[in-house]
Regions:
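Phosphate-binding loop that captures ATP/GTP phosphates
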Residues: 33-34, 41-89
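Walker A/P-loop phosphate-binding motif and the immediately C-terminal alpha-helix
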Residues: 2-42
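Anionic-ligand binding region
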Residues: 154-178
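Cytosolic-facing regulatory segments adjacent to core modules
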Residues: 77-80, 84-131
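Inter-motif core of Ras-like GTPase G domains
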Residues: 134-153
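C-terminal boundary of histidine-terminating zinc-finger modules
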Residues: 221-244
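Beta-strand-loop-alpha "switch" segments that mediate conformational coupling across diverse proteins
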Residues: 187-229
Length: 251
Protein backbone atom coordinates (compact mmCIF):
# COMPACT_ATOMS: atom_id res chain seq x y z
CA UNK A 1 0.00 0.00 0.00
CA UNK A 2 1.47 3.34 -1.06
CA UNK A 3 2.10 6.25 1.25
CA UNK A 4 0.00 9.24 0.16
CA UNK A 5 1.70 12.60 0.69
CA UNK A 6 1.48 16.28 -0.15
CA UNK A 7 3.46 19.47 0.31
CA UNK A 8 0.75 21.95 1.21
CA UNK A 9 0.39 25.56 2.31
CA UNK A 10 -2.27 28.20 1.76
CA UNK A 11 0.46 30.67 0.72
CA UNK A 12 1.64 31.03 -2.85
CA UNK A 13 5.28 30.99 -3.90
CA UNK A 14 6.65 28.74 -1.14
CA UNK A 15 7.82 26.01 -3.53
CA UNK A 16 5.20 23.29 -3.16
CA UNK A 17 5.59 22.01 -6.72
CA UNK A 18 9.39 22.37 -6.70
CA UNK A 19 9.69 20.33 -3.50
CA UNK A 20 7.30 17.72 -4.87
CA UNK A 21 9.32 17.43 -8.07
CA UNK A 22 12.70 16.96 -6.36
CA UNK A 23 11.37 14.55 -3.72
CA UNK A 24 9.63 12.44 -6.36
CA UNK A 25 12.69 12.50 -8.62
CA UNK A 26 14.94 11.26 -5.83
CA UNK A 27 12.56 8.48 -4.78
CA UNK A 28 12.21 7.53 -8.43
CA UNK A 29 15.99 7.24 -8.70
CA UNK A 30 15.95 4.90 -5.70
CA UNK A 31 13.68 2.52 -7.61
CA UNK A 32 10.30 3.29 -6.10
CA UNK A 33 7.10 3.25 -8.15
CA UNK A 34 5.36 6.61 -7.87
CA UNK A 35 2.13 8.27 -8.95
CA UNK A 36 1.82 12.05 -8.95
CA UNK A 37 -1.69 13.49 -9.02
CA UNK A 38 -1.35 16.97 -10.46
CA UNK A 39 -4.18 19.10 -9.11
CA UNK A 40 -2.68 22.33 -10.39
CA UNK A 41 -4.03 23.14 -13.85
CA UNK A 42 -2.16 26.37 -14.41
CA UNK A 43 1.29 27.95 -14.21
CA UNK A 44 4.38 25.87 -13.42
CA UNK A 45 2.86 22.45 -12.78
CA UNK A 46 4.49 19.16 -11.88
CA UNK A 47 3.56 17.89 -15.35
CA UNK A 48 5.50 20.68 -17.03
CA UNK A 49 8.47 20.27 -14.68
CA UNK A 50 8.93 16.59 -15.51
CA UNK A 51 9.00 17.33 -19.22
CA UNK A 52 5.51 16.34 -20.33
CA UNK A 53 4.67 18.01 -23.62
CA UNK A 54 1.65 20.29 -23.26
CA UNK A 55 0.37 18.65 -26.43
CA UNK A 56 0.04 15.35 -24.56
CA UNK A 57 -2.06 17.00 -21.86
CA UNK A 58 -4.21 18.79 -24.42
CA UNK A 59 -4.75 15.55 -26.31
CA UNK A 60 -5.79 13.80 -23.10
CA UNK A 61 -8.33 16.55 -22.44
CA UNK A 62 -9.55 16.41 -26.04
CA UNK A 63 -10.03 12.64 -25.77
CA UNK A 64 -11.78 13.07 -22.40
CA UNK A 65 -9.01 11.17 -20.62
CA UNK A 66 -7.87 13.52 -17.84
CA UNK A 67 -8.48 13.62 -14.10
CA UNK A 68 -11.24 16.12 -14.84
CA UNK A 69 -12.98 13.50 -16.98
CA UNK A 70 -12.44 10.78 -14.39
CA UNK A 71 -14.31 12.95 -11.90
CA UNK A 72 -16.98 13.69 -14.52
CA UNK A 73 -17.47 9.97 -15.12
CA UNK A 74 -16.30 10.11 -18.75
CA UNK A 75 -13.36 7.70 -18.42
CA UNK A 76 -11.68 5.24 -16.09
CA UNK A 77 -8.73 6.33 -13.99
CA UNK A 78 -6.33 3.98 -15.80
CA UNK A 79 -7.22 5.63 -19.13
CA UNK A 80 -6.21 9.03 -17.75
CA UNK A 81 -2.76 7.92 -16.57
CA UNK A 82 0.30 9.30 -18.35
CA UNK A 83 3.42 7.15 -18.06
CA UNK A 84 6.52 9.34 -17.74
CA UNK A 85 8.84 6.40 -17.08
CA UNK A 86 8.17 2.77 -16.23
CA UNK A 87 8.13 3.74 -12.54
CA UNK A 88 6.46 7.15 -12.68
CA UNK A 89 2.88 7.91 -13.69
CA UNK A 90 1.13 11.27 -13.71
CA UNK A 91 -2.59 11.86 -13.37
CA UNK A 92 -3.32 15.45 -14.38
CA UNK A 93 -6.32 17.73 -14.67
CA UNK A 94 -4.71 19.29 -17.74
CA UNK A 95 -6.76 22.46 -17.41
CA UNK A 96 -7.40 25.46 -15.17
CA UNK A 97 -9.98 24.54 -12.54
CA UNK A 98 -9.69 27.60 -10.33
CA UNK A 99 -13.07 28.96 -11.38
CA UNK A 100 -14.93 25.65 -11.52
CA UNK A 101 -17.37 24.35 -8.96
CA UNK A 102 -16.61 21.21 -6.94
CA UNK A 103 -16.73 18.22 -9.28
CA UNK A 104 -16.73 15.21 -7.02
CA UNK A 105 -17.42 14.19 -3.46
CA UNK A 106 -14.77 13.32 -0.92
CA UNK A 107 -16.15 9.80 -0.76
CA UNK A 108 -15.80 9.40 -4.54
CA UNK A 109 -12.21 10.61 -4.42
CA UNK A 110 -11.42 8.23 -1.58
CA UNK A 111 -12.83 5.37 -3.65
CA UNK A 112 -10.68 6.41 -6.61
CA UNK A 113 -7.55 6.42 -4.44
CA UNK A 114 -8.47 3.02 -3.00
CA UNK A 115 -8.59 1.61 -6.55
CA UNK A 116 -5.01 2.54 -7.36
CA UNK A 117 -2.98 2.98 -4.16
CA UNK A 118 -1.73 -0.60 -4.00
CA UNK A 119 -0.05 -0.18 -7.41
CA UNK A 120 2.46 2.37 -6.07
CA UNK A 121 5.00 2.78 -3.30
CA UNK A 122 4.21 6.50 -3.04
CA UNK A 123 1.43 8.75 -4.25
CA UNK A 124 2.22 12.47 -4.17
CA UNK A 125 -0.52 15.02 -4.71
CA UNK A 126 0.70 18.33 -6.09
CA UNK A 127 -1.75 20.93 -4.81
CA UNK A 128 -3.06 24.01 -6.58
CA UNK A 129 -1.55 27.35 -5.61
CA UNK A 130 -4.46 28.74 -3.56
CA UNK A 131 -6.99 27.00 -1.29
CA UNK A 132 -10.30 26.00 -2.84
CA UNK A 133 -12.51 22.87 -2.94
CA UNK A 134 -9.53 20.77 -4.07
CA UNK A 135 -7.80 21.23 -0.70
CA UNK A 136 -10.64 19.37 1.03
CA UNK A 137 -10.33 16.51 -1.45
CA UNK A 138 -6.57 16.30 -1.08
CA UNK A 139 -6.47 16.48 2.71
CA UNK A 140 -9.23 13.89 2.98
CA UNK A 141 -7.06 11.18 1.38
CA UNK A 142 -3.41 11.94 2.18
CA UNK A 143 -1.60 10.15 4.97
CA UNK A 144 1.04 12.84 5.49
CA UNK A 145 1.27 16.59 4.94
CA UNK A 146 4.50 18.59 4.87
CA UNK A 147 4.20 22.37 5.12
CA UNK A 148 6.78 24.33 3.12
CA UNK A 149 7.55 27.84 4.33
CA UNK A 150 9.53 30.83 3.18
CA UNK A 151 11.26 32.03 6.35
CA UNK A 152 11.47 35.59 5.08
CA UNK A 153 7.65 35.61 4.86
CA UNK A 154 6.57 33.10 7.52
CA UNK A 155 8.66 33.96 10.55
CA UNK A 156 6.14 33.05 13.24
CA UNK A 157 3.29 30.72 14.09
CA UNK A 158 0.64 33.32 13.29
CA UNK A 159 1.74 33.33 9.64
CA UNK A 160 1.20 29.56 9.52
CA UNK A 161 -2.20 29.46 11.21
CA UNK A 162 -4.05 29.52 7.89
CA UNK A 163 -2.95 26.10 6.69
CA UNK A 164 -2.98 24.64 10.22
CA UNK A 165 -6.61 25.71 10.63
CA UNK A 166 -7.50 24.29 7.21
CA UNK A 167 -5.97 20.93 8.09
CA UNK A 168 -7.66 20.87 11.50
CA UNK A 169 -11.02 21.69 9.93
CA UNK A 170 -10.71 18.92 7.33
CA UNK A 171 -9.70 16.43 10.03
CA UNK A 172 -12.81 17.25 12.05
CA UNK A 173 -15.35 17.58 9.24
CA UNK A 174 -14.32 14.64 7.07
CA UNK A 175 -12.63 12.31 9.57
CA UNK A 176 -9.32 12.72 7.81
CA UNK A 177 -6.35 10.81 9.20
CA UNK A 178 -3.79 13.20 7.71
CA UNK A 179 -0.71 13.62 9.89
CA UNK A 180 1.46 16.75 9.75
CA UNK A 181 5.06 15.56 9.46
CA UNK A 182 6.44 19.04 9.96
CA UNK A 183 7.61 22.24 8.31
CA UNK A 184 10.37 22.46 5.72
CA UNK A 185 12.09 25.78 5.04
CA UNK A 186 12.44 26.46 1.33
CA UNK A 187 14.30 29.13 -0.65
CA UNK A 188 16.59 29.96 2.28
CA UNK A 189 19.45 32.34 1.51
CA UNK A 190 22.26 33.59 3.76
CA UNK A 191 20.11 36.41 5.09
CA UNK A 192 17.42 33.96 6.22
CA UNK A 193 19.51 31.65 8.43
CA UNK A 194 18.75 33.58 11.60
CA UNK A 195 15.05 33.73 10.67
CA UNK A 196 15.10 29.97 10.10
CA UNK A 197 16.69 29.32 13.50
CA UNK A 198 14.22 31.65 15.22
CA UNK A 199 11.27 30.02 13.46
CA UNK A 200 12.48 26.57 14.46
CA UNK A 201 12.71 27.58 18.13
CA UNK A 202 9.27 29.20 18.10
CA UNK A 203 7.58 26.21 16.50
CA UNK A 204 9.21 23.84 18.99
CA UNK A 205 7.35 25.67 21.76
CA UNK A 206 4.11 24.58 20.10
CA UNK A 207 5.43 21.06 19.48
CA UNK A 208 5.61 21.46 15.72
CA UNK A 209 8.60 19.91 14.00
CA UNK A 210 10.78 21.95 11.66
CA UNK A 211 13.11 19.75 9.64
CA UNK A 212 16.82 20.25 10.14
CA UNK A 213 17.34 20.13 6.38
CA UNK A 214 16.40 23.39 4.71
CA UNK A 215 16.57 24.16 1.01
CA UNK A 216 19.08 26.89 0.11
CA UNK A 217 17.85 29.26 -2.56
CA UNK A 218 21.13 28.92 -4.48
CA UNK A 219 20.68 25.14 -4.74
CA UNK A 220 17.14 25.13 -6.11
CA UNK A 221 17.68 24.42 -9.78
CA UNK A 222 15.60 25.20 -12.83
CA UNK A 223 13.52 22.05 -13.07
CA UNK A 224 12.31 22.55 -16.61
CA UNK A 225 13.55 19.76 -18.86
CA UNK A 226 14.02 18.93 -22.52
CA UNK A 227 12.75 15.36 -22.29
CA UNK A 228 10.60 13.16 -20.05
CA UNK A 229 11.92 13.26 -16.50
CA UNK A 230 15.48 14.20 -17.31
CA UNK A 231 17.14 16.80 -15.13
CA UNK A 232 20.17 19.05 -15.07
CA UNK A 233 21.12 18.05 -11.57
CA UNK A 234 23.63 19.58 -9.15
CA UNK A 235 25.19 17.43 -6.45
CA UNK A 236 24.19 19.71 -3.53
CA UNK A 237 20.51 19.29 -4.44
CA UNK A 238 21.00 15.56 -4.93
CA UNK A 239 22.44 15.15 -1.41
CA UNK A 240 20.05 17.62 0.17
CA UNK A 241 16.90 15.78 -0.87
CA UNK A 242 18.37 12.47 0.25
CA UNK A 243 18.72 14.03 3.72
CA UNK A 244 15.23 15.50 3.59
CA UNK A 245 13.71 12.16 2.60
CA UNK A 246 15.52 10.50 5.52
CA UNK A 247 14.07 13.08 7.92
CA UNK A 248 10.60 12.62 6.48
CA UNK A 249 11.02 8.95 7.44
CA UNK A 250 9.09 7.82 4.38
CA UNK A 251 11.41 5.04 3.26
Amino acid sequence: MGHIMTYINDCQGVGKTTLTFHTVWRLHEKGYRILVIDFDGQGITFSSMCGLDTGILKEKVKEKQSLYHVFAGDCKVQDAMISVTERLDVLSFGMNLSYMQPMTSIEQFRQLIDEIKDQYDYIFIDVNSSPDWRYALILSVVDYAIIPIDCSKSANLLDCMGILNIISSIQEQFHSHVQILGFVANYVDDNDIQLYDDFKRRMALYRYKVFDTYVPFSDVIDAFTDGPFTIRQKQPVYDLFDKLIEQLAII
